[in-house]
Amino acid sequence: MSKDDVIEMQGTVLESLPNAMFEVELESGHKIIAHISGKLRMNFIRILPGDKVTVELSPYDLTRGRITWRAK
């Protein structure tokens, strides 16, 4: 899967789950499970409930995503 295939959306973190997973509510109202991308994990970026984030979704599974950016 290339970078062109991903769907980027904005959302809000609802809660933190085990294993660095998060429940995120997208702007469209859907709730998904998302994990942190490698660069956020490497740089120790903390993600807390209530944070605005950018999520990448795969077109194959729209219920799971990857958090790629945390808004300031």
From Swiss-Prot:
One example GO MF annotation: ribosome binding
PANTHER family noted in UniProt: TRANSLATION INITIATION FACTOR IF-1, CHLOROPLASTIC
Keywords: Cytoplasm, Initiation factor, Protein biosynthesis, RNA-binding, rRNA-binding
Gene3D superfamilies: Nucleic acid-binding proteins (2.40.50.140)
Assembly and oligomerization: Component of the 30S ribosomal translation pre-initiation complex which assembles on the 30S ribosome in the order IF-2 and IF-3, IF-1 and N-formylmethionyl-tRNA(fMet); mRNA recruitment can occur at any time during PIC assembly.
Pfam families associated with the record: eIF-1a (PF01176)
Domain called S1-like: residue spans: 1-72
Keyword check for Protein biosynthesis: yes
Signal peptide boundaries: none
Similarity field: Belongs to the IF-1 family.
GO CC, alphabetical: cytosol
Stored SUPFAM superfamilies: Nucleic acid-binding proteins (SSF50249)
UniProt-listed InterPro entries: NA-bd_OB-fold, RNA-binding_domain_S1_IF1, S1_domain, TIF_IF1
Function field: One of the essential components for the initiation of protein synthesis. Stabilizes the binding of IF-2 and IF-3 on the 30S subunit to which N-formylmethionyl-tRNA(fMet) subsequently binds. Helps modulate mRNA selection, yielding the 30S pre-initiation complex (PIC). Upon addition of the 50S ribosomal subunit IF-1, IF-2 and IF-3 are released leaving the mature 70S translation initiation complex.
The protein's name: Translation initiation factor IF-1
NCBIfam families, per the entry: infA
Compartments reported by the entry: Cytoplasm
